[in-house]
């Protein structure tokens, strides 16, 4: 076998494996002599997916490290089983990456960084645009894979995962150089002394990325592209629930011709992620629960690895009585039920002013009942399967809690009975009225298709209700009074507040993404997100490097008198007062020259 890399991945393929994915077929038909590494049935039979029964075949090919492959980790290391939430069918199996191999990947990323950081922005842009072309050429295959592995409707796979990333790639490719251009700093009166300052931006090095399972393509790919354009290399640990999408991301970069080890994908569950943090990359970007984010931050602190954390949300939507009711109802339905509610920015608390509460609730229920539910691969489906049994049980518990606390389940509130060929991970979109902030489900993140509705009377009450949460990721304000909207928005404790919009701004790559309070630290996307991926260096220059500075040693009564007057002068910023100090500066300089 022709060795092209130094790390490997084993893949166990069964008759249930989804051979329709080019991401699998491509890896199985690499030009290297992989046939000699196959045990069991003939390789041609393996490639056709025509193996009889459930006999597993070990395909010896690499952990995807920018597409380069070698020999195999044995089956004893553990494997991830990829399952289609819609049907419960197994899609494939991916070997977990051993901890020592994760550390080695970070070291290879550091070696690749030496060369990658020297590339010009135009070269990086060409590489990113090539990756963009790969995605465009395979958009339907990628959407199908995302839908199959995450359970979401194919419409959302395209609209909320692929399209936003394509836009981000174009924006960051065209604008990274401008945003990272060296910047001069005004230094006030010091400039009169022949001094100047500027800031230049250096890439950090290796960026470790651990994304969530709910947006397995757009979250990690967007973060990786921004890191790459800033001159960094990337080690990505996809969610253990969506390992095939993670491999597809690696394949995109490989097909685009990225240099080896600039982007590496390490597959695995929690221990693999922990190993990535222990390997001390130059920054960690994590998307997931607040509890796990705190653990990652604590582990990263051992090596002083900085972190960006995008964590939980319990996002409020405030609808005033002068809002467009029809528009607000449609927005609430989409904002609450998109991706079966599995969004950190989903509408999980709807506060509506009493005057329109009945009308708005009625329209929300009517619109909810119109939604079609089923496998995400069906293009007419709006509500697909949830991701896992664990997640759907949280939703069931919250429905029970609402009911026991006295709220009313207006529609939905239960699992959909198992259909032929389908899993039991479908939960009806649920509208709840009579909710109050003291109910437990109003304080915990649900991450499911529940829309609890509360009422309020005054603007001040609405703000207080919205801020009564440990989370602060996003919020939205709905009103025809834009002065009121802006006034309320400024008071809401959230990283993003939309006015007459909801949820979608993660898909605008130019805008920063991140939260307040327990919703996380730092930002991804936008200028602010780009600044998380570089380290600023301040360069200060003295163009009149002839005479000593007046504040140098040795000190004297003359020096102290001068310093006292300089403090008052510089604090005022007055040019005239500074000029008046010139005689004392000359005297002090002569004093130093005599030493």
Where do the PLM segments sit?
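Rossmann-like NAD(P) dinucleotide-binding subdomain of oxidoreductase/dehydrogenase enzymes
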Residues: 186-327, 456, 582
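ALDH superfamily catalytic-core signature
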Residues: 291-436, 499, 584, 588
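Structural signal for hydrophobic packing residues in well-ordered secondary-structure cores
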Residues: 113, 117, 132-135, 139, ...
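Conserved C-terminal structural/oligomerization subdomain of aldehyde/semialdehyde dehydrogenase
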Residues: 46, 52-53, 84-93, 318, ...
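N-terminal Rossmann-like NAD(P)+-binding subdomain of aldehyde/semialdehyde dehydrogenases
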Residues: 36, 46, 51-195, 387, ...
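Short hydrophobic alpha-helical segments enriched in small aliphatic residues
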Residues: 13-15, 22
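Residue-level signal for inorganic ion chemistry
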Residues: 88, 124, 146, 169, ...
């Amino acid at each position: 076998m022709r060795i092209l890399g130094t790390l490997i991945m084993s893949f166990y393929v069964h008759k249930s494996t989804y051979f329709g994915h080019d991401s699998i077929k491509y890896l199985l038909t690499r030009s290297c002599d992989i046939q000699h590494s196959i045990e069991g049935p003939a390789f041609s039979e393996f490639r056709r997916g025509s193996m009889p029964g459930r006999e597993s075949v070990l395909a010896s090919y690499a952990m995807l490290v920018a597409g380069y492959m070698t020999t195999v980790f044995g089956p004893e290391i553990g494997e991830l089983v990829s399952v289609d939430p819609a049907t419960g069918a197994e899609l494939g199996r991916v070997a977990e990456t051993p901890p020592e191999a994760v550390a080695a990947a970070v070291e290879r990323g550091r070696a690749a960084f030496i060369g990658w950081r020297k590339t010009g922005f135009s070269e990086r842009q060409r590489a990113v645009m090539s990756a963009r072309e790969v995605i465009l050429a395979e958009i339907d295959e990628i959407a199908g894979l995302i839908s199959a592995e995450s359970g979401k409707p194919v419409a959302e796979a395209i609209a909320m995962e692929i399209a936003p990333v394509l836009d981000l790639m174009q924006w960051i490719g065209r604008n990274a150089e401008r945003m990272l251009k060296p910047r001069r700093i005004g230094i006030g009166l010091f400039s009169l002394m022949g001094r100047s300052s500027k800031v230049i931006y250096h890439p950090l090095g290796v960026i470790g990325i651990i994304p969530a399972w709910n947006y397995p393509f757009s979250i990690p790919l967007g973060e990786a592209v921004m890191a790459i354009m800033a001159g960094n290399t990337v080690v990505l640990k996809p969610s253990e629930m969506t390992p095939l999408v993670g491999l597809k991301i690696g394949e995109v970069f490989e097909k685009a011709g990225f240099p080896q080890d600039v982007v590496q994908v390490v597959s695995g569950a929690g221990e693999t992620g922990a190993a990535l943090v222990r390997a001390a990359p130059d920054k960690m970007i994590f998307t997931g629960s607040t509890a796990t984010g705190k653990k990652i931050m604590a582990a990263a602190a051992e090596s002083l690895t900085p972190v960006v954390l995008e964590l939980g949300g319990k996002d409020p939507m405030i609808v005033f009585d002068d809002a467009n009711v029809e528009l607000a109802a449609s927005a609430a339905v989409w904002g609450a039920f998109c991706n079966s509610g599995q969004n950190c920015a989903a509408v999980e608390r709807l506060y509506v002013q009493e005057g329109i509460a009945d009308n708005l609730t009625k329209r929300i229920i009517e619109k909810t009942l119109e939604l079609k539910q089923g496998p995400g691969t069906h293009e007419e489906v709006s509500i697909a399967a949830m991701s896992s049994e664990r997640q759907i049980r949280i939703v069931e518990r919250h429905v029970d809690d609402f009911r026991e606390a006295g709220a009313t389940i207006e529609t939905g509130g239960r699992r959909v009975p198992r259909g032929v060929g389908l899993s039991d991970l479908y939960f009806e979109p649920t509208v709840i009225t009579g909710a109050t902030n003291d109910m437990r489900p109003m304080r915990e993140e649900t991450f499911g298709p529940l829309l609890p509705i509360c009422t309020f009377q005054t603007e001040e009450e609405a703000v207080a209700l919205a801020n009564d949460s440990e989370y602060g990721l996003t919020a939205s304000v709905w009103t025809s009074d834009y002065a009121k909207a802006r006034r309320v928005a400024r008071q809401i404790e959230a990283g993003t507040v939309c006015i007459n919009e909801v949820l979608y701004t993660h898909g605008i790559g130019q805008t920063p993404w991140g939260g307040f309070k327990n919703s996380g630290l730092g930002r991804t996307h936008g200028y602010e997100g780009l600044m998380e991926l570089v380290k600023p260096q301040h360069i200060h220059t003295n163009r009149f490097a002839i005479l000593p500075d007046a504040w140098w040693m040795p000190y004297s009564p003359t020096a102290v008198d001068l310093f006292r007057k300089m403090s008052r002068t510089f604090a005022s910023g007055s040019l005239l007062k500074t000029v008046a100090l010139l005689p004392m500066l000359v005297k002090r300089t002569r004093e130093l020259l005599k030493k």
